[in-house]
Amino acid sequence: MNFKYIVAVSFLITSGYAESVKNDEQSLSQRDVLEEESLREIRGIGGALLSVGKSALKGLAKGFAEHFGKRSAEDHEVMKRLEAVIRDLDSLDHPEEASERETRGFNQEEIANLFTKKEKRILGPVLGLVGSALGGLIKKIG
C-alpha cells in the first residue's frame, strides 16, 4: 500500500509540475507576444517621430537655403562685378602673364599707362562695392 501511495503522490506531483511548466510557458509566450507587440508599437512611433523630425529638418534647411540663398538682380550684378574685380586683381598678382596676354606688341610706355588705367579701373569699383556691401549689411542687421 505504501508503494501505491508513493506512486499516486508522485503522479500528482509530476502532473502538477507539468501543468505549472505548461502555464509558465503559456504566460511567457503571452508575455513575449505582448512585449513584441509593444516593441513594434514603440518602433512604429519612433519611426514616425524620426520621419517627422527628418522632414522638419529638411524643410527648415530648405527654408534657410531659400531665404539666405535668394539673390536679387542687384545682388547678382554686384557678385558679377566682384568676380570681375577678383579676376583683375589676380591679373595684377601675375603682371607678367597679364602683360604677355593682353599687351603683346605695345611699347613700355603704353604698358605702364595700361597698368595705371587698370589700377584706377579696379580701385574705384572695389571701393564702391565694399561700401555698398557694408551699407547693405548694416541695413539688414539694423
UniProtKB/Swiss-Prot annotation:
It comes from the Eukaryota. Residues 19-43, 72-121 form a propeptide. Residues 1-18 form the signal peptide. Keywords: Amidation, Amphibian defense peptide, Antibiotic, Antimicrobial, Cleavage on pair of basic residues, Cytolysis, Fungicide, Hemolysis, Secreted, Signal. The modification Isoleucine amide is found at I141. The modification Phenylalanine amide is found at F68. Expressed by the skin glands. It holds the Pfam family Bombinin. One of its GO terms (cellular component) is extracellular region. It is found in: Secreted. Its main location: secreted. Maximin-y shows antimicrobial activity against bacteria and against the fungus C.albicans. It has little hemolytic activity. This is Maximins y/H11. It comes from Bombina maxima (Giant fire-bellied toad).
